[in-house]
Amino acid sequence: MIIEIENLIKKFSIGGGLFTALNDISLIIKKGEFSGLVGPSGSGKTTLLNIIGGLDSPTSGNVKVLDKMINETSHDERALIRKKYMGFIFQSYNLLPVYSVYENVELPLILNKIEKNKRRDKVLNAIESVG
């Protein structure tokens, strides 16, 4: 499994009470699968992504990323996992209008110092996979 979430709950303290942002979320994302998270504003999408990425902690439940309990990893390990294995596209994403689609997809690979000959295949495969 790439991502495995079991019985995830996230509550926030608000005005002397508790607000439940995520209630008993369980899901599995396997290698090779693509997933999208869609919902109205305030439904918990960003909260869930922040927990998966190790940027926030759950109130209860388990979150495994690459067979590691994300809340048991160090700050540096979580940063490496996010850098190498995760991509987040939030509601207000934008492509850079001065670049082609190819160049927009290639840009993160350039920033991560991926060799040019490897970038081409990765970019073309990514573009082909989404049509």
Model region roles, listed by residue range:
Residues 61-72:
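Conserved ABC transporter NBD signature motif
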Residues 19, 70-87:
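ABC ATPase NBD coupling module
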Residues 53:
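Helix-to-loop junction immediately C-terminal to a conserved catalytic motif
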Residues 38-40:
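The feature captures the beta-strand-to-loop junction immediately N-terminal to the Walker
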Residues 68-69, 110-113, 117-131:
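Conserved ABC ATPase "signature" region
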Residues 99-108:
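Short coil-to-helix segment of the ABC ATPase nucleotide-binding domain corresponding to the Q-loop/switch region
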